[in-house]
């Protein structure tokens, strides 16, 4: 019955195809669609278009509602938390934009895809690497994502300092969480907490207060921040905490400019990576390890085609979505 109804609706749409409106939506059309859905809810989009008095296809109505008009859409730039989650989930699921969007409330799959193409692929091109190459994946894993974490923590510390009217905050670092190789989770910054589902925020808060721990990351892939579940339930990267002592990261990418930190314990594992488009191969040596505190990992020497990655970071200071060093405090 339902299938027959849809076929009839589709046939009717084809018949009246010459009367259908094309091009940008008008304010009046938006109001018709919003008011109809508010009164009757979402339904079969072909029938909805006719019932609402819209000379649009059902597909056009659906896309207009999902991507522009629904009330739970988030507006504005992708936040650092959202960036981190996109990078994390993409490393696990690839270009499955709809699946990734399910874990970023208020963001559309098209919006996430545009972020990936205009930001991530752009920086891979500037580094003369393919976005799917192991070299660029390591740049994201060891540079981009940790700096996003620093930026998130700095924003949280700045907000806490303002609330307390307080004192200077200590340097941020990654603190090993115990024998399980995971990291404990700090509280999410309040201004951006809305980008996470409620269960994520509850999990993050529980890790701080000694309650229910945050979702764990899989340790099956060296250096990756893979989530421990493929289900549609909550998915969240494991967050680092502040620690006294070694600073987590410096602005330089080689040992000569690294000013602190704890070297990774596993120096026997070497990354023998295929060449980048620039023709250079990365090598791993104990002397070239930056001051990272990832457990049981080795890291490549970030000299991609002779490109100075530190200068690259500095040159991107105007790019708020890439350069996490501009922490809002």
From Swiss-Prot:
InterPro entries in alphabetical order: EOBI/EOBII-like_plant (IPR044676), Homeodomain-like_sf (IPR009057), Myb_dom (IPR017930), SANT/Myb (IPR001005)
Annotated spans, Disordered: 155-189, 206-242
Family matches, as PROSITE patterns: HTH_MYB (PS51294)
Additional free-text comment from the UniProt record: Plants over-expressing MYB2 show increased tolerance to salt, cold, and drought stresses, and increased sensitivity to abscisic acid (ABA).
Keyword Nucleus: yes
Function: Transcription factor involved in abiotic stress responses. Plays a regulatory role in tolerance to salt, cold, and drought stresses. Positively regulates the expression of genes involved in proline synthesis and transport, and genes involved in reactive oxygen species (ROS) scavenging such as peroxidase, superoxide dismutase and catalase during salt stress. Transactivates stress-related genes, including LEA3, RAB16A and DREB2A during salt stress.
Domain (HTH myb-type) ranges: 17-69, 70-124
Protein name listed in UniProt: Transcription factor MYB2
Main location: nucleus
Alphabetized Gene3D superfamilies for the sequence: Homeodomain-like
Tissue specificity of this protein: Highly expressed in leaves. Expressed in roots and shoots. Expressed at low levels in flowers.
Species this protein is from: Oryza sativa subsp. japonica (Rice)
Any one of the GO BP annotations: positive regulation of response to salt stress
Induction: Induced by salt, cold and osmotic stresses, and abscisic acid (ABA). Down-regulated by salicylic acid (SA).
One GO CC annotation: nucleus
Subcellular location: Nucleus
High-level lineage: Eukaryota, Viridiplantae, Streptophyta, Embryophyta, Tracheophyta
SUPFAM superfamilies on file: Homeodomain-like
DNA-binding region: 45-69, 97-120
GO MF annotation terms: DNA-binding transcription factor activity; sequence-specific DNA binding
Keywords: DNA-binding, Nucleus, Repeat, Stress response, Transcription, Transcription regulation
């Amino acid at each position: 019955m339902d299938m027959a109804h849809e076929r009839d609706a589709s046939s009717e749409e084809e018949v009246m195809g010459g009367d259908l409106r094309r091009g940008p939506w008008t304010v009046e059309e938006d109001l018709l669609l919003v008011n109809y859905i508010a009164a009757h809810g979402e339904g079969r989009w072909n029938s909805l278009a006719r019932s609402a008095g819209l000379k649009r296809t059902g597909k056009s109505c659906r896309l207009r509602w999902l991507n522009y008009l629904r009330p739970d859409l988030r507006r504005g730039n992708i936040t650092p938390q959202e960036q981190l989650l996109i990078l994390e989930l993409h490393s696990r699921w690839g270009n499955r934009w709809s699946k990734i969007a399910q874990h970023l409330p208020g963001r559309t799959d098209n919006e996430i895809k545009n972020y990936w193409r205009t930001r991530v692929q752009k920086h891979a091109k500037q580094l003369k690497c393919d976005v799917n190459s192991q070299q660029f994946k390591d740049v994201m894993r060891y540079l981009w994502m940790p700096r996003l974490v620093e930026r998130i923590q700095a924003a949280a510390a700045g907000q806490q300092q303002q609330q307390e009217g307080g004192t200077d905050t200590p340097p941020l670092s990654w603190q090993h969480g115990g024998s399980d190789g995971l990291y404990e989770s700090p509280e999410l910054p309040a201004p951006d907490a809305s980008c996470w589902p409620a269960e994520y925020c509850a999990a993050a808060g529980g890790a701080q207060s000694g309650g229910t721990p945050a979702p764990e990351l899989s340790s099956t892939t060296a250096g990756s921040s893979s989530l421990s579940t493929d289900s549609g339930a909550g998915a969240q990267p494991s967050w680092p905490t502040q620690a006294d002592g070694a600073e987590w990261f410096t602005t330089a990418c080689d040992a000569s400019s690294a000013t602190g930190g704890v070297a990774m314990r596993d120096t026997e594992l070497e990354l023998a990576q295929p060449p980048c488009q620039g023709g250079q191969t990365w090598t791993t040596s104990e002397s070239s390890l930056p001051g990272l505190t990832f457990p049981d990992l080795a890291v490549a020497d970030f000299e991609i085609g002779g490109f100075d990655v530190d200068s690259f970071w500095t040159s991107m200071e105007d790019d708020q979505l890439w350069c996490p060093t501009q922490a809002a405090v």
